[in-house]
Structure formats: C-alpha cells, structure tokens
A protein has these predicted regions:
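Sec-dependent signal peptide recognition
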Residues: 2-10
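Hydrophobic h-region of N-terminal signal peptides that target proteins for export
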Residues: 10-18
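N-terminal catalytic scaffold of extracellular/periplasmic and nuclease hydrolases
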Residues: 20-195, 200-218, 223, 317-376
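Structural motif
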Residues: 55, 189, 227-229, 264-268, ...
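Metal-dependent active-site segment of extracytoplasmic phospho-/sulfohydrolases and closely related
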Residues: 63, 291-328
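Gly-rich Lys/Arg/Thr-decorated short loops/hinges at beta-loop-alpha junctions or inter-strand turns
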Residues: 113-121, 226-238, 273-279, 348
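Active-site His/acidic residue clusters
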Residues: 158-164, 233-237, 257-297
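Active-site regions of oxyanion-processing enzymes, predominantly non-cytosolic
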Residues: 214, 218-228, 248-270
Length: 376
C-alpha cells in the first residue's frame, strides 16, 4: 500500500505539471536564484549490505517518459520494485547570487550518481576544481569486486565515463577510451568503436582483455571483455537495433557473477534521452520498451540472487514530456523543450538496503549510499 501511495504522489505531481506545462514554458519569472536547502532524511539500512549491485540508469527519463511507456507499450516493469522515491538532479554550476543552474547534463549528474559529489556541467568524475573524485566502480575494484559498464550510447559517453574515467570535459571521448583501456574494468559493452583505434585495442588486449564486435562471440572466462557493437551509439530500437540492452546485460552478468566477492555493474539505457532531444515520441516509446525488458531481466535475476541490490533511476529528465489525449483515442505526447529539464526523476530499488531509497533525495545521496554499501 505504501508503494502505491508513493506512486500516486509521483503521478499527481506530474499531472499538475502536465496541465500547466505549456503555459509555464512561455512565462518569464523573476525568482531570485537560490539553491535548495533540504535536510534529506534517508533511512538507516536494515543492517545487511548487498553483495552485488545492479545500477540501472535510464538517461533522460522522468515521469512523462514512463507515462508514455505505460500507455503506448502497455508496460510498467518498475511496478515490480519494492521501494520508490524521488530525486532532485541540479548540478553545482555557478554562483546562486548571479547565475546558478538548476538543469544538469549527464556528466555532472553522472558524477553525482557515481561519486556522490556535485560538480559542474561537462565534468567527468572531477570536482568543481577539476580534481578527480573516486567513483563507486573504483571503490568496488578496491574491494575486490568484479566491475562492469554497459550502455547503448558510446561506452565513452558521459554517463558510463563518469564511473570509470576522470576528465575535465565530457567531449574528450578519445581520452576517456584511453583511460578505459588501462582501467581493468572487467566488462565494457556498448557502442563507440570510432574512439578505439586498433592501437588502443592492442593495449587493452595486451593487458589481458578480449575485444569482441559480435554479441554472440564466445568469450574467454579468464579475460576481461570489451564489446563494441557499433561505430557510434547503437541503432535506435524503432529502427531495428540488433544488440539489445538485455543481451548485453545478460553477457555482463554471466561474466561478473562468478566473482566470489560480488560485482558492481552500471547499465545505461542511454537513448531515451536522445528521444527527448529529438522530440520524438516514437523514439522514446522504443527505448522505453527496451528499458522495460531490461528491468524485467534484472528483477528476474535478483529473484534468484537475493543478495543483489537492483536500483533504477535517471540522471535527469529530457524534453519536459507530458502525455495528453489525442484524436481517435491515441496519445498526444507534448514536449516543452528539446533539452534537459530540472524536473525531479523517480528512483526504484529492490534487494538488501533498498528501503533507504524510499524517500525524497538529492542525486548525490544515491552515490553516497551505494558507495557505503560497497565499502561494507
């Protein structure tokens, strides 16, 4: 009942926004810039930390995108989670006496999620002074856990990069690839071969890695895996993506869950965000179908591995998506922008330690708590 009530609060909040979103888009306010000051009250843990963590990030996905999926695809896999909360995503970018920002990008929010630290837009796991900050993937490696990154974008894109690299600007994907090649991450799967020249692949392989370009390639269980299945990001779902997020997640878990010390894997459904930037309901619908399949796979896995914590959230919302009735019973999906918004995003969790996320929180609280679990 509590989970249902929390969902109702989320939906009610979004309904109010949807009704007045178009008008608000055009209204110029004179609010004095301030950063929010909230005493976040995350619960204490149940006393049992998870052995392993599956951290799913659906890029650019707010309540509007889930509403599109619910009505257009007839699916809402997150309803299977035990706990649900709400997340603020603003970056630390600018002085609030003059020009602070409420709208994050995937680099700043990725760093908040990976390291529990606020930073400026564009920063990849560095603080506002451009000093590296330690990520949960690096903490997991230090604690002897197997580690993995999966994305439907380039693997060097902002969100996955924020877990395994440190650069001052997100567009330095070639440099991020160079860092990944020597980072000893056990599994890296996604797109972006163009940032991995043969010389860099050789460096990776000489350090005990196996490069694959076909998801069906037999992998050596004694080697780390780098799978790059497209030159750039993977193909859109509605255009016939050949390698699904769930296929990559399955391959990752088959190789990570052999580690007796547990594993950490971040899996990004990257392109819901791109559908928001494109103002394409069809794009969003396809990527949300992929997300639903991924969530079902992860929760099915967790049901037979009860020591695994599964967390699903977003780095930010994109497009200011709202759903209305269209003609002849179809959906009228409206956008208030072609960029990110400051709208809160949901978080869901199931498994040991999941109940702490049944709250309103800043995105840094997610990173901090998951790092605490890894350190225990």
């Amino acid at each position: 009942m509590k989970r249902i009530m929390n969902l109702m609060v989320l939906i009610s909040f979004w309904g109010c926004y949807s009704m007045y979103g178009a008008a608000l888009q055009e209204e110029k306010t004179n609010f004095i810039p301030t950063q929010p000051h909230v005493n976040y009250q995350l619960k204490t843990t149940e006393g049992v930390a998870p052995k392993s963590i599956i951290f799913i990030i659906s890029d650019g996905t707010g309540i509007g995108q889930y509403t599109v999926s619910y009505y257009a695809n007839g699916e809402f896999a997150p309803a299977r989670f035990d706990h649900v909360g709400l997340v603020a995503t603003h970056p630390n970018d600018g002085e609030c006496s003059t020009s602070c920002k409420r709208v994050t990008d995937s680099a700043a929010s990725g760093t908040a999620l990976s390291a529990g630290r606020k930073t400026y837009n564009g920063a990849i796991a560095v603080d506002v002074d451009k000093n590296p900050v330690k990520t949960m993937l690096e903490w997991a490696q230090e604690n002897g856990m197997a580690t993995g990154l999966v994305a439907t974008s380039t693997v060097t894109h902002a969100t996955p990069a924020s877990f395994g690299a440190h650069v001052d600007y997100r567009k330095k994907e070639a440099e991020i690839a160079e860092q990944f090649a020597i980072a000893d991450i056990d599994v890296i799967l996604g797109g972006g071969k163009k940032f991995w020249p043969d010389s860099l692949i050789s460096i990776y392989e000489n350090r005990g890695g196996q490069f694959i370009s076909d998801i069906n390639t037999t992998v050596d269980s004694n080697k780390r895996i780098l799978g790059l299945f497209s030159d750039s990001g993977l193909e859109k779902v509605h255009n016939g993506r050949e390698v699904s997020t769930t296929q990559m997640a399955k391959l990752a878990l088959e190789n990570l869950d052999k580690d007796p010390d547990g594993f950490f894997v971040m899996i990004e459904e990257s392109q819901v965000d791109w559908g928001g930037h494109s103002n394409s309901a069809e794009y969003i619908k396809g990527e949300m179908k992929s997300l639903n399949d991924l969530v079902n796979f992860a929760l099915d896995y967790q049901s037979t591995h009860p020591d695994v914590l599964v967390v699903l959230t977003a780095d930010h919302e994109c497009g200011g998506v709202a759903v209305h009735d269209g003609n002849n019973g179809d959906l009228d999906v409206r956008f208030t922008s072609d960029y990110h918004s400051a709208n809160f995003v949901p978080i869901w969790a199931t498994g040991p330690g999941a109940s702490v996320f049944d709250a309103f929180m800043d995105n840094t609280e997610i990173g901090k708590r998951l790092i605490e679990y890894i350190q225990e």
